[in-house]
Amino acid sequence: MLSRRRVFAVERLGGRDGAFEDLAQGCVVPGVTCTYRRIPDNTHECSLDFREGQNELRGLERQMPLLKLASQDSGMEMVVGDSSLATLSGLSQDSLNLEPMGSPELPPAQLDRLLARQKLEEVLERSREFPSLSAQRGPLQLLNKPVDGVPIFAGEQESTEADTELEAGLEEAKEVGNMESAACTCLPGQGLRYLEHLCLVLEQMVRLQQLYLQLQTQRPSRDPEEEVLAPALSSSHIPDNRVQEHREELSQTKDPEGAEAASLPEVGVLVTSPSRLPEALLEPTHILPPSQEPKDLSHWDKVKVLLNRLRWRSPRLPEPPVPPDGSGSRMEFRNLSDRTPCHSQRKTFIPALVVKKPRAKNLSV
């Protein structure tokens, strides 16, 4: 006989259809819309069973939170006697979220979630237990900060300090690799392992870049262009310096009185004779200190010195000793005035190149 009233009977654990076993395992309780129960003719037995079922439900409520009943989800009206089941305070809002509260029997999905959470907490605790790594990162960051626009260790650190810091960075990288292997063995999922590995690799790259920048600031290198230009400039100044050195040797070999007396006539000749002006302009002006002057002269350099001597030498009469009243300077100027027409009358032989044009032959065709 099927009941017309919307009432269902709750049976004991281990009953015929095992409704309470499903309830203990966290399944949705079948409501009135799912099944109809056969109600026995003896109403007294039904009421006793119903009361015992209520007591068992209260015991289960204390152990773990229950899900919503199907009758509550559907919004159907319940019988007056079922109001205690409908107004349970321990019912959860989400029928798919089960939070185990110490029950010994759990489904495998919940066990996996619990294990994942425990392993993540262990990883976080391990990361907090390594403050030495963060303490070592502090001085590396402070080294790269400039003071008033100038790096702290620019030109002041020695190579030994740089080597020790490099060794410390390599040791730290080894420690990071060990941590990475330990974290990979502890993390539950492949995605979390990949993220942890990526973070460790990025941290290691940052440390290596900081060490590289630190070494660059400690050992400033010269410009390659300056290194190339320096020997070229020194080689270009060598011949002029040699000529200047030979001229100084010539002036030292002369008598001191003759050198003093010949200084004014040479100046006068340079001013009066225009042919000597280009030679004076072409004289070298680069002078090196005596420590840098070349000492070894080749045969070709000696020949050049002799040619320069012949070019610079000018015929002049022997000067008399200079009297103290300064009349010698007047005599030198007179000699210069007498000597100037002789210089103008001298003819220098300059070979000229004459290009002969070939005569065009008229050919009759």
From Swiss-Prot:
Residues 218-262, 315-342 are annotated as: Disordered. Residues 239-257, 331-341 have a biased composition (Basic and acidic residues). It holds the Pfam family DUF4657. It comes from the Eukaryota. InterPro entries: DUF4657. This is Uncharacterized protein C8orf58 homolog. It comes from Mus musculus.
